[in-house]
Amino acid sequence: MSYLKFDKALMINLEQSLPKEMLRTNKSGAYHCTSIVGCNTRKQHGLLVIPIPEMDDQAHVLLSSLDESVIQHGASFNLGLHQYGYNVFSPNGHKYIREFNCETVPTLTFRVGGVILTKKKVFISHENRILIKYTLQEAHSPTTLRFRPFLAFRNANSLVVENGAINRDIQHVPNGIATCLYDGYPSLYMQFNNEAKWVDDPHWYKGIEYYKDKVRGIPYKEDLWVPGYFELPIKKGETIIFSASTFETDPALFEQTYTEELKTRTSRTSFYNCLKNAAMQFYLKNEYGTYIMAGYPWYNVRGRDELIGLPGCTLAINHDQEYHVILDTFIKALRHNIKTGEKDRVIHEIDLPDIPLWLIWAIQQYRRYVNIDDCRKRYADTVRWLVETIRKGGIKNLRLDPNGLLHSEGRETPVTWLSASIGGRPIIPRTGYILEFNALWYNAVRFLAYLLGESKKDAEYVAELNALAETIGDSFIKTFLNGYGYLYDYVDGAYTDLEVRPNMAIAVGLEYSPLDRRQRKRVLDFCTRELLTPKGLRSLSPKSQAYRPVYVGNPTEREYAVHQGPARPWLFGFYSDAYFKVFGLSGLSFIERMLIGYEDEMSEGCIGSLSELYDGNPPYTGRGAVSTAKNVGQILCTIKTVNQMTKLLDAQESANSTI
């Protein structure tokens, strides 16, 4: 039985199939994303969506879709699908779908009378290019395929309407055409491996709707330009390959390119393989370095997200080299930012006060998953520089107080991951002593002391670090641990924030925590009772009057709700670490059971990946960006930890059996 396979009954039921999406990317930030039935449901959906650095740092939809029609005996059967109003779809091509399988490459099987046609899509790894392979498996009469391209040429976060500014010119190229609708955009080359007949038939297709945008309370209607169509005859057993790219290609090489790309694919035949594929889709390489995208389809590179997702998206899938290259790029960018105050060209939010703390944590994961000696050799100097820069006040909006704690000002501008704001002002004004900042700070100082512990020349400095850690730890307990047994989320002077939030799971789950085992267990119990869901930890306890579990409504309503209840899978990574620290090997079966909730998502939302957030209440519907790096990365980390713990348990049981 296939791991990711959907049958006719599901595919023709649009209530079930339309919410399911698929994503494929390359290493330049380009992507292909749509619903599994091929009907675009977001403005960010498209067959070929690419970054255009000369214009901005966002993606742009060139080719929105390609509608295929099967022609026999003069009758045309259109396989496309677009929405034009509430429950109004045309041309209803989904009714011909018999199966969708995306274990290796997304594959649709259509049946039109006696015709069986398969459609396989491959997004090229290192080029802004997609190949679609059509194979006529069965036919009893002469058959022709017609292809009608729907063009957008717009920012992926905007919409286009009929206008007279478009360039209607068509340039004929080998087995296809090239066109460019607006100045500043690259030409779109659409070619086939066989000779194709092009027919000029220019039309605006007006009033196409994207229902997921409508639900989000944002503009959702647009007009798309269709300049004409291609026609090619096809015989039983024959294959036609379509290529869409920003450069002219040799049609004779299409089959070879397709086959070579297929060899590089890891089949999505398991939970782990799905997440491994999802992780690699976040890799981004450009002239400035190598990065991890925060998520698709609308996020770019964001500092905190990159660091939280990095260990899982590289080390947990044995991509150590990518870890080093990405980390080296980040360290270089952060050094430049701290030295000059200039924002980075690629990494957004690199100047937030907790970035150095998360960077140290990301380095620490290399020691955890790979090797302490190599970690020491590669990164000890960087960790030392970061700790000393913090101690000397070199990080903007991060002040070290005499009590050893770090202070940040967040009343006017959000400084933490709970960053929702209205009118530029934070909804949750976390300011003063912020819980995870200081937990990460204690962890960082202890980690540096550990890295330098074997160095005789650093013995005095290590003693100084350990003394500082003692001061931080004592102040942390006095400041954050309350009489109820959990941790204040932030403390600002005499004000203590009593809301039960998941940042305390971070404090418990870190390798070095100022909390003793009894304190950790009490805090963990609060997380389990009030925050834990099958899709991660809630951002706020349901007992709070501010609790808003469902992330729906217009942009303002969603902004108010985003950090007031919806659950995040990435926080489960810290929760599982905390659980193992409290319960050891006896906690293994519980964490394994909890992972089932994430595996269930492999056939929901964005197939094979994890959404940005999930409703805090059942049925825990996925919301936000369809695929996010820190969620995928942290669940991969948990899987790796579970595998390590399983080996320890097996070894322990084996040793006991020989006694």
Kindly give the residue locations of the regions a language model identified.
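Glycine-rich, acidic and aromatic/proline-enriched surface loops and short helix-turn segments
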Residues: 277-285, 328-336, 600-607
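Extended, well-ordered alpha-helical scaffold segments
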Residues: 146, 256-267, 271-275, 318-332, ...
